[in-house]
Amino acid sequence: MLARRSIITHPCAGAIELPLLVPAFSSKGFRLKQTRRARTTHDFSEVVYELMDFGARPSSSVMVSAYDLYFGHFDAPEQSSPKPETYLRNSRLVFLDSGGYELVPDIDSSGPKAYAYTPKTGFGPGEYEGVLQRLAGLSKPLPLVIANFDHGTRGEPLRTQIKSARGLFKRFPDCTSDFIIKPWTPQGRIIEPSQMTETDFANLRGFDIIGVTEKELGRDIFERIKRIAKLRRGLDDAKFSGPIHIWGGLDPIMTPLYFFVGAEIFDGVSWLRYAFHNGIAINREIYAIVSQIGVTASGLLNHAYASLDNLTALNNLTIALQQWVDFEGKRFDMFHPVVRDHLDRAYNVMVSRIAEIDGGV
């Protein structure tokens, strides 16, 4: 089987047990508010209040974007010490996105209603590295997992992507590296592990984590699952045991399916947009009705309860995934009763249709 329970070791944080289901925070698609500072107008995201609440409690991991840090979107105006580093201290690992998600104007039209979004100009590789230098230079550095600057690199040869990422990661040796592979053919939009050579896989051994965005694995669910399986098998054959990170792959149904074929790290803002109820993601607005909060609850109260319950659901799902591996994929009773049979049937199909799961090619 391709699924496993691994451990990654961070230079500052030590050993971290996987899988990790990483709550992400981003200004994209959420409302920007304004405040005045020294006669200038400052934009900050309403998500900062979620981040403040999240940071008040210990957590295994969190993700923020260098784009938002650079523009001060997570600087809360009411706080005497508003810098977001304050909110991140309680997380054992802090994943830093290079800003690729925020630099793309598209918002998933199939998702819940989001605010109109236009990326700000003036953020690129140099600004990203400036954020890294500032965070790495703190008297007490954060336990960072950093990505390569992947925006605009689609179509670059894989060896070029690898060389550029190595140069960046070498300058920040106290950070764990998370190399995001982008489609490497001139017109390619999808990652195709089946086209990677043994040398390509071997060249990835210098990184700590290998990342792919969910969207660049394909539009169809089963195609994405097959590509993750091929990537995991290729890495294993190349003697690379580091985890696969599915960027944007945080979902109560999709995350287990990706985990079953070897991915171990998943992030996303879905936990801020949806409500996780009975093992599935539902419209957040109706959460008060189907939960114990009640139909008379205000939108603010409903949102607060949904966020807190979502974090509990992610923690429970993490434990379930670990138990599933412990039982060698033969039991599904650790998952929510509403979805366990569906996951069982899906995995049986995957085993019969994806040779890599049982060691084939």
Label every model-predicted segment.
Residues 124, 157-161, 220-227, 303-306:
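Residue-level preference for long, well-ordered alpha-helices that form the structural scaffold
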Residues 1-176, 351, 355-361:
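Non-catalytic, usually N-terminal nucleic-acid engagement modules in DNA/RNA processing proteins
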Residues 140-143, 207, 263:
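A structural motif
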Residues 65, 149, 213-215, 269:
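Conserved residues at the C-terminal ends of beta-strands
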Residues 176-245, 251-256, 261, 271-292:
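Glycine/Thr-rich beta-alpha phosphate-binding loop at enzyme active sites
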Residues 1-56, 236-244, 252-361:
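Alpha/beta catalytic cores of nucleotide-metabolism and tRNA/nucleoside-modifying enzymes
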Residues 62, 146, 209-210, 266:
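Hydrophobic residues within beta-strands of alpha/beta enzymes
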